[in-house]
């Protein structure tokens, strides 16, 4: 690994994912390498179908690669056992998706609390962490509102609070502003960047939004699953 990235918490080397075989083989991503340090924002840029979501699923251990390696801290994610992946998703990696993924019958606080319930944290700790998480995204006072009572930007803030309600080393966000207007999307990304810096989280965001790209420490541009020079449209 290059000397410049020895302190990276998230690394990928030669990461490849194919679907099917032979003439029917489809490239999800091909030979992608990257590294993200604590407190850094890396943007994966590309048009629809470029392979952004495939790459993020591999980085977060949601899918297994065809070839290559992913490491988060000391864990070889591609070779991890199911138990190790459960621990990874419970304690280390937080996910934020374009669709928010909130349960409509639960309040904002109850949605944020879900990962803590799954981890069997005690009630006092859950209350404290949920209150702190909602306050960190500017939603204190909205604890008892359900998703249908919140704006799109507020719902995405709840999703971010849920992803970070437990201390996380890595945050992976797939088109987090895709369903938001430009002003609200910018506010959400300002929040993500602030939390990335303040908490020392290694954050990876997939997007083609130029406002988000402008905030990045590093940009990886994908086309047909392969890394291209940034700005290369050929």
Name what the model sees in each region.
Residues 146-150, 154-156:
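Conserved ABC ATPase signature
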Residues 75-76, 124-141:
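Conserved ABC ATPase "signature" region
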Residues 68-76:
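Conserved ABC transporter NBD signature motif
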Residues 106-114:
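Short coil-to-helix segment of the ABC ATPase nucleotide-binding domain corresponding to the Q-loop/switch region
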Residues 23-26, 77-94:
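ABC ATPase NBD coupling module
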Residues 60:
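Helix-to-loop junction immediately C-terminal to a conserved catalytic motif
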Residues 139, 143, 163-164:
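ABC ATPase C-loop
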Residues 165-169:
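A short, proline-enriched helix->beta-strand linker immediately N-terminal to the Walker B motif
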